[in-house]
Structure formats: structure tokens, C-alpha cells
Amino acid sequence: MNVYDFDGTIYYPDCVLSFGMWCAIKHPRLWFTFLPKAFFYLTLYILGIMPRYRFERKGFGFLGMVDDLDEQLEKFWDKHEKRISKWYLAQKKPDDLIISASPECIIAPIAKRLGVSYVATEYDREYGVLLNNLMYAKEKARYIFDRGFPVINEFYSDSLSDTPIALCAEKAFYVTHRAQKVSDWPELDRKTLDRVHSKIDTGTDIHLD
């Protein structure tokens, strides 16, 4: 089994951001009802006031403001499916697993089109809450552990935050250049490990508040 992060790895740039902009164009009221709040949350996150998991949850908030969400998701992927990296399509296998911090409702349609399995963040768009921890950093490795540690032949990601699950794979690859260049995973020297530790910090081990 090969495992892939999604955003920045086999899709560029970020499906939540891309779909959020798509929805704002289709439903212009979001420019006034959601985007000002989104920029406020971003400021709090950059200043270190809001932890990563809460920033992500707040960023998913627009999903509950779009009445025709499922229809818009299909139309979005009709147009954006072409952004899936060609290098991935050339090596795609039926037992691939996409593992992503993005919400399930966004990842599910494209995973179905690709014919592969997926696991993503469980988010209740009606109530605006996470139903489980954000599928990010250590949570990806925890998911693998909880499934009996299946063999991961190859793992691909664009982020050092995925180092915990990269260490679970027989071989890990680092994706850069707008999801176009694939290289070996960086050596985990002290400087790199310091970066890893800062990236995997979500603020708390429980993401449900």
C-alpha cells in the first residue's frame, strides 16, 4: 500500500482554500459573512493566539453556509480534478490511501473519482465541530497504529508535519515545487527535527472543543 497526503502533495495548492474561493464566487455573500472572520482567525493563528486545530476548524466554517454544498463539490472537482499531479496519476494503484487533514466532504468526491481509499478529518458542517481529532501530523500515524499497522510501502507528503507517519513507511518521499517534484524524505538532523516539532504542535492532544 502506498499512502499520500493530499494538499500540496498530489493536489496544488490546497483544496479547502480552492473550494472556499469557489464557493465565494458562486455565493458572493460569503465575502461578507465568512471571509472577514477567516482573516481574523488567520491573524490569531499567525500571532500564536489560536492553535492549529482550532484555526483549521474555524476555516471549515464556510461549509455550513453553502446550501447546495454537494452540488458545488461535484462542479468544483469537475473543473479542478485536472490539478491532480501527473506523476501521481502515472503511478496510481487501486490500494492507494489518501490521508488528509482536509474535511471528508471535500476529499471523498475526488477519492471516488480516482478510485482509491481515503481518510480525512471528520467535520460536522451543520454544527461546525470536529467529530474526531484533526487528521494532521501525529494523528495520521495514530490512524495507522489503530488499524494494526498495515505495511506502507511508500509515503508521500509536502510537509515535515507528516514525519510521524513517514517514519512508519518503508520509504518516504518529500514533494515540492507545487506538487511536481518528488525527492527522498529529508534527513532528520537536529535542525530538521526542531522544524518537525514546531510543525506537529496542534496546541493540544484533544481537538474537540
Where are these predicted regions, by residue range?
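Short, compositionally biased "basic patch" segments
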Residues: 34-62, 111-114
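C-terminal cap/substrate-recognition subdomain and adjoining C-terminal extension
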Residues: 76-209
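Active-site neighborhood of HAD-like aspartate-dependent phosphohydrolases
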Residues: 1-48
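Generic secondary-structure transition motif, activating predominantly at the C-termini of alpha-helices
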Residues: 24, 39-47, 63-67, 77-81, ...
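Metal-dependent phosphoesterase signature
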Residues: 51-86
